[in-house]
């Protein structure tokens, strides 16, 4: 039971940090805008839902590797990611341009 509690707690931690980014930072939502930020190397972190289509996922990961931007795989589907962002719609991928008051970039790179 302890590992599941730890996984749930880290998931809640990511959700809290993501909400802080939504309030105080800059971000883009959606596949096309994420690709634009990757091409221009503006993003600091890319977050993908676990049910993101494989072709989109591989394309985003390839662009992120070329731009040297880290990718975090969210442990929920696109509905959960949209809810964590405080939106009422599904979010497949998002790019964090400026984390604001949140330290989400340092915590997600150390957990992977």
From Swiss-Prot:
InterPro entries assigned to the protein according to its UniProt record, in alphabetical order: Ribosomal_eL30-like, Ribosomal_eL30-like_sf, Ribosomal_eL30_CS, Ribosomal_eL8/eL30/eS12/Gad45
Tissue localization of expression: Expressed in roots and leaves.
Keywords associated with the record: Ribonucleoprotein, Ribosomal protein
GO function terms (MF aspect): RNA binding; structural constituent of ribosome
Domain of life (superkingdom): Eukaryota
Annotated Pfam families: Ribosomal_L7Ae
Gene Ontology CC: one annotated term: cytosolic large ribosomal subunit
Family: Belongs to the eukaryotic ribosomal protein eL30 family.
Xref: PANTHER family: RIBOSOMAL PROTEIN L30
Entry protein name: Large ribosomal subunit protein eL30
Species the sequence originates in: Triticum aestivum (Wheat)
């Amino acid at each position: 039971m302890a590992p599941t509690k730890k996984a749930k707690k880290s998931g809640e931690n990511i959700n809290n940090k993501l909400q802080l980014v939504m309030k105080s930072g800059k971000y883009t939502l959606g596949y096309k805008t994420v690709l634009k930020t990757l091409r221009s190397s503006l993003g600091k972190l890319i977050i993908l839902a676990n049910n993101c289509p494989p072709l989109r996922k591989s394309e985003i990961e390839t662009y992120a590797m070329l731009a040297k931007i880290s990718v975090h795989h969210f442990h929920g589907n696109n509905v959960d990611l949209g809810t964590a962002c405080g939106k009422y719609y599904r979010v497949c991928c998002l790019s964090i341009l400026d984390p604001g008051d949140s330290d989400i970039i340092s915590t997600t790179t150390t957990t992977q």
